[in-house]
Structure formats: structure tokens, C-alpha cells
């Protein structure tokens, strides 16, 4: 998985475990696609300090995932749901409307 995408997904799961400043910087970098220099200017700090904070947060998020495996479980669940829905559609001739209804209900589990 591409690092940037993986970190963004980990942020969705674990951002509440970061400090407010860490969340803010990570959101600016990964969600808003600001450069290190732009984030440093907004935070009145050095580019190097922002770089270090992001790298530290990346490691922290990866550490949370290695211990809790929430992203892995979520991806496995998503794959299972998609396979189940495809099987349902093929074997039981489920209409597109019903397919979408089942999909929505399963995703909300």
C-alpha cells in the first residue's frame, strides 16, 4: 500500500490518540497537501521541526496499527462484504436496488 494512503487511513482510525497539534499538522500535510514550509509558517516553527513531528507521528500510527490491527481488520471486513455481495448478486439474482441496500446496511455494521 502506498505510504501516503496508508497513513491517511491510519489517521482515520487513530488520530484521536494524537495530540491536537499532531492532528492539526498531520491533517494539513496529508489531507490539505500543504508543504512542510507552509505548515512551518502556519505554526511559526521550522520546516525541520514539522518534518520531525510528521515522521514521529507516522511511526506512532504504524505502531498503533501493529498492536491493534484495526486497519487490517477493516480491510479484511470490507473485502469479505464485497465478496459476499458479489456472491449474493450472482447466486440469487439480487436486483441492483437490493444490492445497494444490502451493501449500505453491511457497511454500517
From Swiss-Prot:
Species: Clostridium botulinum (strain Alaska E43 / Type E3)
Descriptive protein name: UPF0122 protein CLH_1195
Entry function: Might take part in the signal recognition particle (SRP) pathway. This is inferred from the conservation of its genetic proximity to ftsY/ffh. May be a regulatory protein.
Domain of life: Bacteria
Family: Belongs to the UPF0122 family.
Amino acid at each position: 500500500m502506498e505510504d501516503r494512503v496508508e497513513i491517511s487511513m491510519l489517521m482515520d482510525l487513530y488520530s484521536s490518540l494524537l495530540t491536537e497539534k499532531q492532528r492539526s499538522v498531520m491533517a494539513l500535510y496529508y489531507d490539505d497537501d500543504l508543504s512542510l514550509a507552509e505548515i512551518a509558517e502556519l505554526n511559526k516553527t521550522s520546516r525541520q521541526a514539522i518534518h520531525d513531528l510528521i515522521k514521529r507521528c507516522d511511526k506512532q500510527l504504524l505502531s498503533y496499527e501493529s498492536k491493534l490491527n484495526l486497519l487490517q481488520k477493516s480491510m479484511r471486513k470490507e473485502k469479505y462484504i464485497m465478496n459476499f455481495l458479489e456472491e449474493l448478486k450472482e447466486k440469487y439474482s439480487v436486483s441492483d436496488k437490493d444490492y445497494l441496500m444490502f451493501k449500505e446496511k453491511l457497511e454500517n455494521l
